[in-house]
Every structure is written in structure tokens, then in C-alpha cells.
Amino acid sequence: RDSRAASANGGDGKAPRVARWMGNEKVLLLTFPDAATQRRALGRASMYLEDPEHRGRVAKALPAGARGGVANYSGHNARVRELVAFYNDARGDDGRGAWEDERAMMEALVDAGVVRKEKCGRVSVSAEWSRGRGRDGWGDGEPSTTRRDVVPEACVIAVCASGDAREVQDALLHEAMHGLWYARDDFARWCYDFYLGDALDDAERAAWVEFLRELRYDVSVEEIVVNEFQAYMATERVLFGPDTCAGKSSSSKKSS
């Protein structure tokens, strides 16, 4: 099921398509018309949520090159409430701080019924989706990202279009695993137990953290570390596959 919204700037075709995953309606897929639009719509939000220098702060511009980090990845993911928090901060006191493509994305989520727009222009998660919806009813308690109190919530994932179908498939699988993390509390808890249990030793966990640090993730946040671990280990076939052992060059499928 999907819906399409007009652009925040008068129907210029830049609004993303919003589709719900049939297997779990809490997972929403955003499809943008091109990679540049997706980067402008989600780049600053990803920095706000995952970048070590900008976490919790709205960047004034998107960094280029190696310093681009999470802003430059071809895949993005976030809880809807996290996107809402970013957008409200980005708007600023005068309501004009959000970029055009960020506004178009939020309007698409409003039209999909996932986000509610207030008269003042601020947004909030629609009550129907504030804890997510599923066969087992609603999650309860306050939303949390702590290890033992993960509440299933509505989330969005996005993947850039590309002429390489295999690349798109790999990136989509990676982002879908993040969707499961947000939407299924039992899955997230299992991943925490695996990562922090006896399956890995301290040296292996340290190596993983260093890998994420080089990709410019905020490794001080345990959820980021474990969430990325499960997504990479469940789907990565290039960086950690047999081709790597054969000495073939490779790059992260998330890099654009």
C-alpha cells in the first residue's frame, strides 16, 4: 500500500513514495526520485541521529567526501518519532529552517497518515502509529532505546535507486534488517543478547566498533553499534564474504 504527496514547493515531483511493508506495517519504505533528492531529504536527519559530531544537532550543510559519513550512504533508516524530532528542530523558531526536500518528505508522511501536522507547522507521530501496530496490539510504556526496554515502533527505511539491481537489493536487505530492529522488540532484544553474550569476545567487539568509527558512526551509542552489527552480519556479502578473503577490492554497499 502506498501514497504520494505533492512537494512542499508546489508539486515539483520531488516528494517520495511511501509504501508499507506487507509483512510488518510498522516498516515504511520511502522511494525518492533520485539519489540527490534522497540525500537532501535524509542526509541531515541521519547526521542528527548517528554522526559523532552532529548527533542531536542540526547540521547547516551536508559534508562532502570522506567526511560525509552517514549523510552520504545510499541507505537510511530511523524511527518515525526520531525523524519528527529532527524535523521540528530543523524548522527552528521561525519555521523556515527545514530544507525543501525535508519538507516534502514530511508532507508525504503526513499524507500517509503516519505523521500529524499541527497548525503551527510542527509535526508529531499520529496516535495510531506512536507505538506501532501489529497482530499483538500496541506496544506499551515509554519508547526507549535501552537494551531491555525496546518498544516496537513505526520506522522508515530508504534506498537510492541505481542501475545496479544487485546493489539496490543488497542495500534494501540491509535497511530492512534495521526495520525489523525498530518494529520487533523481540528481535532487537535477541540481537543485544547475541552481541553482548559469549558469541563474541572483547577483541571482536572492539574491532567492530573501530569499523563503525571509520564509517563515522557515533559508537558511543550502544544501539547504533548493535543495530549496525545485526544488519551487516545478516546481509553483507562483499565486505565480509569469501570475495574479501580472495583479495578482491570492495566498498560498503551503504556508501554512495
Which residue stretches match the model-derived regions?
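Long, low-complexity, polar/charged, intrinsically disordered or flexibly structured peripheral segments
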Residues: 92-149
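Short acidic alpha-helical/loop segments enriched in Asp/Glu that coordinate divalent cations
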Residues: 185-197
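Active-site recognition of the HExxH zinc-binding catalytic motif
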Residues: 170-183
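Short catalytic/ligand-binding loop motif for oxyanion handling, primarily in non-cytosolic enzymes
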Residues: 16, 37-40, 180, 188-190, ...
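Short, flexible loop/turn elements at secondary-structure junctions
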Residues: 34, 160-163, 177, 185, ...
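N-terminal low-structure segments adjacent to metalloprotease catalytic domains
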Residues: 1-100, 104
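Short pre-active-site segment immediately N-terminal to the catalytic Zn-binding motif
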Residues: 155-172
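Metalloprotease/metallohydrolase-associated module, dominated by Zn2+-dependent proteases
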Residues: 1-5, 10-33, 131-158, 196-256
